[in-house]
Amino acid sequence: MWTVAKIRADYEGWWLFSDWTDQIVEQYHFETYEAMMNFYNSLILKSKDYYDNYLVGKYNIHAFYNNCELGFCEDCDEDLQIFYSYIVLNNNEVYYNLPNIE
């Protein structure tokens, strides 16, 4: 089974933190790779229009953000940029072979 999970976090390098699954705000499930990729491609293209900015990081994973969408970090006593990423999972394991979507 394929899953596309949207995470919301105040950091972009989600793969550096073991608790990234705690940041999931939406999930979409698919039976086939083709169905998942059709949805994922559409989601990335729509997100490029919706968000002010994006970065393409490790494993071709996009991190989207809007200017001035900040969250206060109590531990560091400052406002941090909020990022949104879509993580693809295959049978609950992160799938790292994503194509670059232009």
Residue ranges, per PLM feature:
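Ordered hydrophobic segments in well-structured contexts
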Residues: T3-A5, Q27-H29, Y84-V88
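Short, mixed-charge low-complexity intrinsically disordered segments
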Residues: L43-E102
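A structural detector for beta-sheet-dominated domains
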Residues: A5-I7, E31, H62
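A short, exposed loop/beta-hairpin motif centered on an aromatic-Gly-Thr core
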Residues: T21-N38
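Short aromatic-glycine-(Arg/Gly/Cys) micro-motifs in beta-strand/loop hairpins
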Residues: M1-V25
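Conserved long hydrophobic alpha-helices within structured protein cores
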Residues: M1-K6, M36-L43
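Intrinsic disorder/low-structure terminal segments
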Residues: L16, H29, N38, G71, ...
